[in-house]
A protein has these predicted regions:
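Outer-membrane beta-barrel translocator domains and adjoining extracellular loop/strand segments
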Residues: 27-33, 78-84, 113-116, 139-145, ...
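Membrane-embedded beta-strand positions of outer-membrane beta-barrel proteins
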Residues: 16, 56, 68, 103-105, ...
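Outer membrane beta-barrel
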Residues: 1-65, 71-73
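Residues on the lipid-exposed face of transmembrane beta-strands in outer-membrane beta-barrel proteins
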Residues: 2-7, 54-58, 90-94, 116-120, ...
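Residues that define the transmembrane beta-barrel architecture of outer-membrane proteins
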Residues: 1, 8, 48-52, 84-88, ...
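Repeated loop/turn-to-beta-strand initiation elements of outer-membrane beta-barrel proteins
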Residues: 11-14, 63-66, 96-103, 124-128, ...
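Transmembrane beta-strands of outer-membrane beta-barrel pores
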Residues: 9-11, 20-22, 72-74, 96, ...
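Detector for outer-membrane/organellar transmembrane beta-barrel domains
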Residues: 125-227
């Protein structure tokens, strides 16, 4: 269900049509992936829903590259093409020694978005992180993800696991997830409706462990924890204990 026209040169790539891209270093939570991100709880991530877009890439001699994306959308109310419904983004990917980094500049649904991502080796493990700033009608909002991943071999089976902390700047600052509480957070509701966000809280911890049972079969349990709910429950129980 994807049709696009592509040109690939020695250092340049141009594509126009239905396609999918993934940006950022988050494995479960992806604040920098502003175009059709995966639900963190998605089981099958082999196929990603795409957008009708223009994509361009320029590869430098040192391995760094620049990517640009333009997505034109219509206003669902009047059917007109509008800049406030469209997206234009440029991302620079570079190497600094053994480290990698990304710089993002975008105009997304009429809002300016800046992003910084980095990954590096940390004692044999891989550290990854994204920091994203969005200039909304309600002011500046930051979102971030940081994670640590490690791979090893036990009993001739390949294992890998990672731990991620996610700060969702658009999420509820407290544990009020009622309809009235969510209605007071239109920035969150807009992103939920557009399929850009899947979490309504603010602080999350996610972890995953994969074991390769056979070359064609692997087992991957994931755990997601809403830290606000956990701490609120702990505080209530502790308060009840100390009160008596």
């Amino acid at each position: 269900d994807r049709i696009n026209i592509a040109y690939t040169g020695e250092r340049t790539v141009f594509r126009f049509g239905r396609q999918a891209i993934s940006w950022g270093n988050g494995l479960l939570f992806t604040p920098m992936d502003i175009f059709n991100p995966f639900d963190p709880a998605a089981v099958d991530k082999e196929y990603k829903t795409g957008d009708n877009m223009f994509y361009a890439q320029y590869l430098q001699n040192n391995g760094n590259d620049v990517q640009a994306v333009a997505v034109v959308r219509r206003n669902l109310m009047n059917g007109d093409v509008e800049m406030d419904e469209s997206s234009l983004a440029v991302k620079y990917h570079g190497f600094w020694g053994t480290n990698e980094y990304d710089l993002l500049l975008a105009e997304h649904y009429g809002e300016r978005v800046l992003g910084l991502a980095a990954s590096t080796d940390f004692g044999g493990a891989i550290w990854r992180g994204d920091l994203v700033w969005t200039d909304t009608d309600d002011g500046s909002i930051f979102s971030a993800v940081a994670g640590l991943g490690y791979s090893w071999v036990i009993a001739r089976h390949n294992w890998n696991g990672f731990l991620e902390y996610y700060y969702n700047g658009f999420g509820q600052s407290d544990s009020d997830y009622s309809a009235a509480g969510l209605a007071a957070n239109p920035e969150l509701l807009q992103r939920l409706a557009r399929g850009e966000l899947f979490n309504i809280g603010r602080h999350y911890l996610g972890t995953s462990l994969t074991v390769e049972l056979t070359p064609l079969l692997s087992f991957t349990p994931n755990i997601f924890i809403n830290l606000i709910t956990i701490f609120s429950s702990f505080g209530s129980r502790a308060g009840g204990i100390f009160k008596h």
